[in-house]
Amino acid sequence: KSADGKITLNVINYHVGTDYAADYYEYLFDAFKKTEEGKNVEFKFEEIPTTDAYNQKIKLLISSGDLPDIVLNGGNNITALAAKSGKVTDITEYLDKDPEWKAMFSDQDLEFNSYEGKVYGIPVSKEISYIYYNKDLFKKAGLEAPDVAYETWDDFYKACDTLKSKNITPVSMDTADLGWLSNLWYSGLIGTAGEEGNKFMNTMYPTDYTSDLVVNATEQLQKMLKNYTTADALGGKYDTMATHFFNGEVAMLPNGPWMIPDFKSTDKAPEGFYDKVGIMLLPGSGMESVPTPGDMVGAKDPEKIKAAVAFLKFETTAENQLKALEMAGLQPVSSNNEVPESLKESDPLMAEVLDIQSKAKYTYGQNQAYWYQNVIDTFSTQLPELAYGNMTAKEFCQKLTDAAKKN
């Protein structure tokens, strides 16, 4: 504390400039100072304008140096690394003392942010994805989209065949840069394949991809790459594929809520595109849902630790979770949020995203969150070979397994 009783918290902030959440974090730091717990708190900021530079800096400070009092998450899962260094606070007792706060998070969220049974990170959002579809293209093909999802993958393929018969490319897929879109289709194919498939897609670092179930999903992914996507998907990157969707050249694309602001942006999509977009879950009512790395406390002084924990608590109030959704497209970490009337008017698509989550029968992870890096790389580099028919689904799965076993 300084002489005037103020507590100064050091923060390295990458939510600055044109960052998607810059306005939200500016609001959050200001609003906290107006609360009972934050009225004596001042923030001292060091600004780093990119996530990559920020993540490198934090990793450096974990190995040698002092961490900021509040360690914002940069999307990288560094919980174990930080916990092992002894430089971050164990938040478990604070959560246990406040059951209402603890109830905001699922066991999965807290487990993801724990090391050796102790919680070190407080997640502020979760990553989810589903399917966006173009209402105009569905109408043109004489198709009525399901309210929630196609009941089966076969129903989904029938719709793809109908779209194709009207010269409409059914889905966006990619293979370069880790093949994000193809990974979301693949994760859905496995994650909705009954209890066994769902368990597999919720497992961290699997090492065996040779089960009939995964081979079958791979055969279906191969079919989609061969029959239902754009010619440039092989070797193609996400940005190009997203542009196809914006331009009305593709009927469906899997992705998360962070894409919604792009539908309104005339830099990316044509005027009025937002109104043409609908949402559905993956066939079988599947939805990717992955816990995110949380914010941590790097403060040493007991007064500062107390103030930093109070900030994390403020950051995750129901009100601020919805504010983060409205201002930054961050998906609330709690799944029982009321959909505010104001959101239904200002951003009906985002309101629909909040609403449809409770209708998922299967939730599962995706490979970039749960698989070894070299397996993700192998997935991306071997996809074109699979698509061209240069290898069978079985051989593809063996390559993933060989890569995983090297870890």
Placement of each model-derived feature along the sequence:
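Short amphipathic alpha-helical coupling segments at ligand-binding clamshell hinges
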Residues: 24, 216-220, 303-315, 323, ...
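Short helix-initiation/N-cap motifs at beta->coil->alpha
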Residues: 47-57, 74-76, 150-157, 232-246
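Long, aromatic- and glycine/proline-rich binding clefts that accommodate carbohydrate-like moieties
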Residues: 108, 275-280, 325-378, 384-385
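Conserved N-terminal structural module of periplasmic/extracytoplasmic solute-binding proteins
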Residues: 1-80, 84-85, 96-100, 145, ...
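Hinge/lid segment of periplasmic solute-binding proteins
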Residues: 74-130, 157, 184-187, 274-278, ...
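Extracytoplasmic/periplasmic substrate-recognition and gating elements
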Residues: 7, 34, 39-42, 141-144, ...
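Extracytoplasmic/periplasmic solute-binding protein
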Residues: 115-124, 129, 139, 154-206, ...
